[in-house]
From Swiss-Prot:
This is Large ribosomal subunit protein uL23. One of its GO terms (cellular component) is ribonucleoprotein complex. InterPro entries: Nucleotide-bd_a/b_plait_sf, Ribosomal_uL23-like, Ribosomal_uL23/eL15/eS24_sf, Ribosomal_uL23_CS. Keywords: Ribonucleoprotein, Ribosomal protein, RNA-binding, rRNA-binding. Part of the 50S ribosomal subunit. Contacts protein L29, and trigger factor when it is bound to the ribosome. GO terms for biological process: translation.
Length: 100
């Protein structure tokens, strides 16, 4: 198992992904995050449990493909990223939308 230092845990989780599908997954106590492409499932689990103080029961990851992006006559691409869907134990939640 890979040793992860607490200072690098925050670097593994980049941001939560808030899309229509990700919002529907919240009902099943599943949360979607963009993570570092080199992160492994045990590292992601350790990072989520440490940062949010929750119990993770499952993780599925997928590498999202590079998509072409055109702006005028210039053709480029969107960066590739890794998406992690994290399932929490029923008694835990993550507050992604804090009260204002």
């Amino acid at each position: 198992m890979t040793k992860v230092t607490p200072t690098s845990l925050a670097d593994l989780i980049r941001r939560p992904i808030v899309t229509e599908k990700a919002t529907l997954l919240l009902e099943n106590n599943q949360y979607v995050f963009e993570v570092d492409p080199r992160a492994t499932k045990p590292q992601i689990k350790a990072a989520i449990e440490e940062l949010f103080e929750v119990k993770v029961t499952g993780i599925s990851t997928s590498n999202m493909p590079i998509k072409k992006k055109r702006i005028g006559k210039f053709i480029g691409h969107k960066a590739q990223y890794k998406r992690a869907t994290v399932t929490l134990a029923p008694e835990f939640t993550i507050n992604l939308f804090p009260e204002v």
